[in-house]
């Protein structure tokens, strides 16, 4: 009799819609993926979330954090030979050019310019090696569990996996931390900007490479990445009804298929959340 009463009660709840249905597990191609609560850092879903992987240009999120916390956006950056020689993607900075730090930061975040990242790193710390050590230290302070930076722009062909790696969880956590900075949020939300060096002789129109920002309701954006080692990567964020979710997908694939997969992986994670 007791079992029958319980059964009738459960049937009643189902009819009333009071029994919550569990969201379907997301299908994600990425080698490593994480979805976290953007306010608490709690892991909501993961796939190899703590596996050390290359993270490509999502690295530049941490570069931006240090620039925002340690430099003035109006200070003048003089481009070094090292910065000017960085490979594509670059904004063709020339040795000796002078730019405001804010212009380089915005261009770096929107279009992933490698030369801008190095110029900013040298401005903040004097040289790239010192800047990378500060990046790694900051990651630990934020709560990252297995992240080492050997490059301010994410290029990794000259580095071993031990010298430059992170995890999907750590990159999501770093992304969530960056979003607490209002200037960071304002920069990544822009669709297009126009910047120039101080002389006005090197104008540059920069469009945002983040498709997620346009294709997903509530998207806040953040940062794409790709190297031959890392594959296509993306750290993304969205906010609806006051709930902020941050995701990271590392190694979503290679070639055109991988480029598309990082978007579908991210959307699947956000839909699950």
Predicted regions mapped to residue ranges:
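Sec-dependent N-terminal signal peptides of Gram-positive bacterial secreted proteins and lipoproteins
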Residues: 3-23
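Domain-terminus/edge residues, biased toward the C-terminal soluble/receptor-binding domains
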Residues: 144-145, 159-273
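Hydrophobic alpha-helical membrane context
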Residues: 15-16, 72, 269
């Amino acid at each position: 009799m007791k079992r029958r009463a319980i059964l009738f009660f459960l049937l009643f709840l189902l009819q009333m819609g009071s029994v919550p249905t569990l969201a379907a597990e997301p299908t994600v191609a990425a080698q490593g993926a994480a979805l976290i609560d953007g306010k608490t850092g709690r892991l909501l879903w993961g796939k190899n979330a703590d596996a050390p992987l290359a993270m490509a240009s999502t690295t530049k999120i941490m570069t931006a954090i240090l620039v925002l916390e340690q430099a003035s956006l109006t200070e003048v950056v003089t481009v070094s030979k090292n910065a000017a020689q960085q490979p594509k993607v670059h904004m063709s900075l020339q040795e000796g050019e002078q730019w405001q730090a804010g212009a380089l930061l915005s261009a770096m975040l929107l279009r992933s310019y490698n030369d801008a990242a190095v110029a900013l790193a040298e401005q903040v710390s004097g040289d790239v090696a010192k800047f990378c050590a500060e990046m790694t230290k900051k990651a630990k302070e934020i709560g990252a569990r297995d992240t080492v930076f050997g490059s301010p722009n994410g290029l990794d062909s000259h580095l071993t996996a031990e010298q430059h790696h992170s995890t999907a969880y750590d990159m999501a956590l770093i992304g969530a931390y960056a979003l607490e900075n209002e200037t960071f949020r304002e920069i990544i939300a822009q669709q297009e900007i126009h910047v120039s060096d101080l002389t006005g002789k090197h104008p540059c129109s920069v469009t945002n490479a983040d498709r997620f920002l346009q294709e997903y309701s509530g998207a806040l954006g953040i940062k794409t990445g790709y190297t031959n080692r890392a594959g296509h990567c993306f750290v993304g964020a969205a906010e609806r009804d006051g709930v902020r979710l941050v995701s990271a997908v590392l190694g979503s694939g290679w070639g055109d298929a991988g480029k598309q997969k990082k978007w579908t992986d991210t959307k699947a994670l956000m839909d699950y959340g």
